[in-house]
Curated annotation (Swiss-Prot):
This is Proteasome subunit beta. It is an enzyme of class 3 (hydrolase). Keywords: Autocatalytic cleavage, Cytoplasm, Hydrolase, Protease, Proteasome, Threonine protease, Zymogen. GO terms for molecular function: endopeptidase activity; threonine-type endopeptidase activity. It is found in: Cytoplasm. It catalyses: Cleavage of peptide bonds with very broad specificity. It comes from Thermoplasma acidophilum (strain ATCC 25905 / DSM 1728 / JCM 9062 / NBRC 15155 / AMRC-C165). The active site is at residue 9. Residues 1-8 form a propeptide. Pfam families: Proteasome (PF00227).
Length: 211
């Protein structure tokens, strides 16, 4: 189970004073074979909430659909968005209920309500909130970058550059991570905004990194 969970992805989420930034790369692998170079691993599940996926693609995509439906129903019934902690708790409970036949996934949930939040959630439903988190086979390299360069006082632009550097570090050392980088910024003012690919490419070049 652990081998399945840790293969083929690098995702990251960080909190700043007034924002959350989430990022993934796009490579999809099956053991040593690159199945897809443009896999989607970063999703908007509500106005102010994003989710990243690692693990079995089918399991992860089902959970994304479930969460989108649950959060939309909550918003229609109560006329407010579900708090981020409640989103993480709901997803955690869903996974824990099937822990003996688990969804083979590692997930990040990030968003902003009264404050920015990032939660990492494992296949058994374990949920941990932190100022930053990473999942997938490239996560050790991401944590190396974050531990030395992260600051809660960063601007959004600095935070975007940081997650790009972190994912790029994983791509250089982890053969199961690669391809283009996807980045989303979540703020109270604008909600969930995924940055255009050409903007990410421009930032990568400016930082002197390899596409």
């Amino acid at each position: 189970m652990n081998q399945t969970l840790e293969t083929g992805t690098t995702t990251v989420g960080i909190t700043l004073k007034d924002a959350v930034i989430m990022a993934t790369e796009r490579r999809v692998t099956m053991e040593n074979f690159i199945m897809h170079k443009n896999g989607k691993k970063l999703f908007q599940i509500d106005t102010y909430t994003g989710m990243t996926i690692a693990g079995l693609v089918g399991d992860a995509q089902v959970l994304v659909r479930y969460m989108k439906a649950e959060l939309e129903l909550y918003r229609l019934q109560r006329r407010v968005n579900m708090p981020i902690e409640a989103v993480a708790t709901l997803l955690s409970n869903m996974l824990n209920q099937v822990k003996y036949m688990p969804y083979m996934v590692q997930l990040l949930v990030g968003g902003i309500d009264t404050a920015p939040h990032v939660f990492s959630i494992d296949a058994a439903g374990g949920s941990v909130e932190d100022i930053y988190a990473s999942t997938g086979s490239g996560s050790p390299f991401v944590y190396g970058v974050l531990e030395s360069q992260y600051s809660e006082k960063m601007t959004v632009d600095e935070g975007v550059d940081l997650v790009i550097r972190a994912i790029s570090a994983a791509k250089q050392r982890d053969s199961a991570s690669g391809g283009m980088i996807d980045v989303a910024v979540i703020t109270r003012k604008d909600g969930y905004v995924q940055l255009p690919t050409d903007q990410i490419e421009s930032r990568i070049r400016k930082l002197g990194l390899i596409l």
